[in-house]
């Protein structure tokens, strides 16, 4: 099929066969897997996955690609013609394995959308902009550590698996890409009942990265609170571990009761 990649959908089609083979090896699909592919494009991963799987669910917003996939892979392919940001993944049950070459223009909101369904997910493998993957897996006190790191690390264990050069795509993106593996934790570090407060505190802490916690969290914690938590209020948001954010969330939650 000749298909002109659509800029508004952020389409960059994976065409490097050696990279495709390596990704399939990393994912390691087996018969019986409940696999969902987001943004299958022209089927670079779809075809080798269907060689193994009994059924593959795909989510694709581009109507032309949906028509092509329907004609090319009848039978074992179940196609959802919808924006992945609007898809209710709970409709597909549990034990989900989700993969995809995610459009870079919606990757961050899509990751947060998928986080809502973490209890139903076994693992996820995504092709993303390398810079985004580096932020996802970043450690405290490093330049890439920020809101994305903390919010996702609360729910997932994550690992950067493979760097993919721009020339592996058609058209080549202006950035390097990478595969990231995401596995949900048995229990989030910060309980889901506190997630709204957690997000509020993290946003406040990172609202002015150059300022100290004494300033950014002044509406949430007193000097005595910082001392009780054994957290230096002269630190900045990027210096705190997830465990320290969990302690802050507990303190603020208790203060509000």
Swiss-Prot record:
Keyword list, A-Z: Cytoplasm, Methyltransferase, RNA-binding, rRNA processing, S-adenosyl-L-methionine, Transferase
Enzyme class, UniProt record, top EC level: transferase
Known EC number: 2.1.1.182
Compartment(s): Cytoplasm
Chain positions recorded as S-adenosyl-L-methionine binding sites: 12, 14, 39, 60, 83, 101
One annotated Gene Ontology cellular component of this protein: cytosol
Catalyzed chemical reaction(s): adenosine(1518)/adenosine(1519) in 16S rRNA + 4 S-adenosyl-L-methionine = N(6)-dimethyladenosine(1518)/N(6)-dimethyladenosine(1519) in 16S rRNA + 4 S-adenosyl-L-homocysteine + 4 H(+)
Recorded GO MF terms: 16S rRNA (adenine(1518)-N(6)/adenine(1519)-N(6))-dimethyltransferase activity; RNA binding
Subcellular location, principal: cytoplasm
Keyword S-adenosyl-L-methionine attached: yes
Domain of life: Bacteria
Function noted in UniProt: Specifically dimethylates two adjacent adenosines (A1518 and A1519) in the loop of a conserved hairpin near the 3'-end of 16S rRNA in the 30S particle. May play a critical role in biogenesis of 30S subunits.
Family stated for the protein in its record: Belongs to the class I-like SAM-binding methyltransferase superfamily. rRNA adenine N(6)-methyltransferase family. RsmA subfamily.
Listed name of the protein: Ribosomal RNA small subunit methyltransferase A
Organism: Nitrosomonas europaea (strain ATCC 19718 / CIP 103999 / KCTC 2705 / NBRC 14298)
Gene that encodes the chain: rsmA
């Amino acid at each position: 099929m000749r298909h002109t990649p659509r800029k508004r959908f952020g389409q960059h089609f994976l065409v490097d066969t050696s990279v495709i083979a390596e990704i399939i090896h990393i994912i390691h699909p087996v018969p019986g897997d409940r696999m969902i592919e987001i943004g299958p494009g022209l089927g670079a991963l779809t075809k080798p996955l269907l060689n193994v799987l009994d059924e593959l669910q795909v989510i694709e917003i581009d109507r032309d690609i949906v028509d092509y996939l329907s004609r090319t892979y009848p039978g074992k392919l179940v196609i959802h013609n919808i924006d992945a940001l609007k898809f209710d993944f709970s409709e597909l049950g549990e034990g989900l394995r989700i993969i995809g070459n995610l459009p870079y223009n919606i990757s961050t909101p899509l990751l947060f959308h998928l986080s809502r369904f973490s209890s139903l997910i076994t693992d996820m493998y995504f092709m993303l902009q390398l810079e985004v993957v580096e932020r996802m897996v970043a450690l405290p006190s490093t330049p890439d550590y920020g809101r994305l790191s903390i919010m996702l690390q609360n729910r997932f264990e994550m690992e950067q698996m493979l760097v993919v050069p721009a020339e592996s795509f058609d058209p080549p993106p202006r950035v390097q890409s990478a595969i990231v593996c995401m596995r949900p934790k048995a229990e989030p570090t910060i309980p889901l009942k506190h997630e709204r407060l957690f997000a509020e505190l993290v946003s406040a802490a990172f609202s002015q990265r150059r300022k100290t916690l004494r300033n950014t969290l002044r509406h949430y914690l007193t000097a005595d609170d910082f001392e009780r938590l054994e957290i230096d209020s002269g630190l900045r948001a990027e210096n705190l571990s997830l465990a320290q954010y969990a302690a802050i969330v507990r303190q603020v939650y208790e203060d509000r009761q």
